[in-house]
């Protein structure tokens, strides 16, 4: 893969050598919630409770990343108890909710974990995510992201947000780091 323009065939389609090289160095994966971990729809109950659907495959990918020494964090603009519960279930300990300026949480994570920006991947779906995405080593937009975000990302998933896009990114990171086979048979 040393040739310029070379790519690696994956089960999701070809991935450029440049993206693979960036993915090799990722030690922290940061995720948005609405439109990334969920499909972006919010269901409101009669008593004001919020409901969102989370993809089990995304959860498995997150667990595999965590057990492969890749930290996972969430930075989201909204605040919801069910996101706290989902993080607890998956073992995500870095959760920043209600963040209208995601750069503040991003800076806090870098300092807390002593990680350089080039060792961070960020998955987003909308323009609120761009300020962080332009600072990380690997910026990822989900397939159904805002049209202005897609051309700015290093990698665009083939799968839509909430439908397995996070699993695709986790698999990409694990593949690039030679850890994908270690994930077989794990339980969440």
From Swiss-Prot:
Name of protein: 3-deoxy-D-manno-octulosonate 8-phosphate phosphatase KdsC
Tagged with keyword Metal-binding: yes
Enzyme's top EC category: hydrolase
Native source organism of the sequence: Escherichia coli (strain K12)
Coiled coil: none
Record key words, sorted: Hydrolase, Lipopolysaccharide biosynthesis, Magnesium, Metal-binding
UniProt function note: Catalyzes the hydrolysis of 3-deoxy-D-manno-octulosonate 8-phosphate (KDO 8-P) to 3-deoxy-D-manno-octulosonate (KDO) and inorganic phosphate.
Pathway this chain belongs to: Carbohydrate biosynthesis; 3-deoxy-D-manno-octulosonate biosynthesis; 3-deoxy-D-manno-octulosonate from D-ribulose 5-phosphate: step 3/3; Bacterial outer membrane biogenesis; lipopolysaccharide biosynthesis
Keyword Nucleotide-binding (UniProt): no
Reported consequences of knocking out the gene: Not essential for growth.
Residues where substrate binds: 34, 55-59, 63, 78, 86, 102
Cofactor(s) required, per the database record: Mg(2+)
Binding site for Mg(2+): 32, 34, 125
Domain of life assignment: Bacteria
One GO MF term attached to the UniProt entry: metal ion binding
SUPFAM superfamilies: HAD-like
PANTHER family cross-referenced by the UniProt entry: HAD SUPERFAMILY MEMBERS CMAS AND KDSC, N-ACYLNEURAMINATE CYTIDYLYLTRANSFERASE-RELATED
A Pfam family recorded for this sequence: Hydrolase_3
Family, per entry: Belongs to the KdsC family.
Subunit organization: Homotetramer.
Record EC number: 3.1.3.45
Catalytic activity: 3-deoxy-alpha-D-manno-2-octulosonate-8-phosphate + H2O = 3-deoxy-alpha-D-manno-oct-2-ulosonate + phosphate
Database matches in InterPro entries: CMP-NeuNAc_synthase, HAD-like_sf, HAD_sf, KdsC_fam
